[in-house]
Amino acid sequence: MVELRPSLDIVAPFFNEAASASAFARLLGELEVAVAQRFGMTVHKILVDDGSRDDGAVRFSQALTGSWEIVRLSRNFGKEVAVLAGLDQSRGDMVLIMDADLQHSLDISLKLIAELVDHPDIDVVYAQNDRREASWRRSQLARLFYSLINSSQRFDIPENAGDFRVMRGAVARALTSLRDKRRFNKGLFAWAGFRQKALPYSPEGRASGTSKWSRLNLIAFSLEGFTSFSVIPLRLISLSGLLAALAGALYGAKVLFEVIFYGIAVPGYPS
């Protein structure tokens, strides 16, 4: 009887990463060998082309080894949707999500997997950016964002935790059942629950190119998360509506009072 080995799926979305394709394919190959040796697991690699305008998909297909597939999206939907597309294809006992820009190292990836393997009571191990390289202003803005978004919820979104994480297959299945059109993965990962553990890390520098996240993209992303996972905007809108209604009622009472008791002719409806 053939004994089935546990399996690990690696989901890696990419956008215009042709320059780093060969290096990332090598990293995945090294990771596959290390995972097989240390944990006795088979590895299947799922790369998601998020509408790249370069030949990254071709370069990946030429450089990848072992078991792999490339999911090609019809346009650039954004990383959040690309991650979902990869999770939709995953069938492994565990699923590792990592970036294709080489900022997520082999060493940290193995540590994440080891934590999950060694702790059967844990369902998710996520990498938490220690922000050593971030400016003081950016760190303070991030802290303010998380304090606001977590101030009115029954669950907390971990600070500085992104998509870089490993999870059990059951968690991946639960996440794929959440079909939000406007996705904010940080919030969805936390909302889904399960037993989660943080692993601090410092991301590597990009191997080539620049970040695809502009300041405007970051602001839009933050607003998406804030409006999706905080009741503060709804309460502010409700309060502003209440104040506007109260102001209108007071003004209407003032107009009627002047017409009835002082005979002041106000042009318009009270005359």
Regions found by a protein language model. Give the residues of each.
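Short, hydrophobic secondary-structure boundary micro-motifs
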Residues: 41, 125-126, 157-160, 235-238, ...
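Residues in soluble alpha-helical coiled-coils and helical-bundle/repeat scaffolds
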Residues: 15-19, 103, 107, 176, ...
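Acceptor/aglycone-binding surface of glycosyltransferases and processive sugar-polymer synthases
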Residues: 73-75, 79-89, 106-185, 204-223
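A ubiquitous structural signal for well-ordered alpha-helices
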Residues: 24-27, 31, 112, 144, ...
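Structured catalytic core of nucleotide-sugar glycosyltransferases
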Residues: 1-134
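Residues at helix C-cap/C′ positions in short coil/turn segments immediately following an alpha-helix
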Residues: 39, 120, 153, 230-233
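Hydrophobic helical membrane-anchoring modules
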Residues: 1-7, 186-271
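Non-catalytic alpha-helical coupling and interface elements of nucleotide-dependent molecular machines
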Residues: 33, 150-153, 194
